[in-house]
Regions:
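Active-site loop-to-helix "anion-binding N-cap" substructures in soluble metabolic enzymes
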Residues: 1-140
């Protein structure tokens, strides 16, 4: 049986897209993050990807939105915090994930991040929709 590779076994990720789902489900009230621990723990790994010149596609969720645009659960405050902590270009993608998302993010350069808005704003994420999964995997 073939051994499953660990991410640390992969040496060359230069110019490759890496889809990273991080747990940024943290307490946010009035656009202020009240516990940054989960974010801070992820930063060294993200920085390592950037150091290796990967194109980082970062996704996460926050809470359980009641609608597709519950702005109280936007990841924008986390995006702003990451901009302060990571010395690399970070883009914010506020659109739904569709079959043409890959084209829309084709501008992403090595050593940059695109941070997607709350993944749970996409109905397909909540419903475990196969087409949504295909669209999401196509960006990587």
């Amino acid at each position: 049986m073939e051994k499953i590779k660990k991410f640390t076994d992969i040496v060359d990720i230069k110019n490759k897209r890496v889809l990273l789902r991080s747990d940024f489900n943290v307490p946010v009230f009035k656009e202020e993050i009240h516990d940054k621990t989960r974010i801070d723990v992820s930063i060294p790994f993200i920085q390592n990807l950037l150091k290796k010149k990967a194109k980082v596609i970062l996704i996460s969720h926050l809470g359980r939105p009641k609608s597709e645009k519950d702005m109280n659960l936007s990841l924008k405050p986390i995006f702003k915090y990451l901009q302060e902590k990571i010395d690399h270009k970070i883009h914010f993608y506020s659109h739904k994930i569709t079959n043409n998302t890959k084209e829309k993010i084709s501008f992403l350069k090595s050593g940059e991040i695109i941070f997607f808005e709350n993944i749970r704003f996409n109905v397909g994420e909540i419903k475990n929709d196969e087409n949504f999964a295909k669209n999401l995997s196509s960006v990587a």
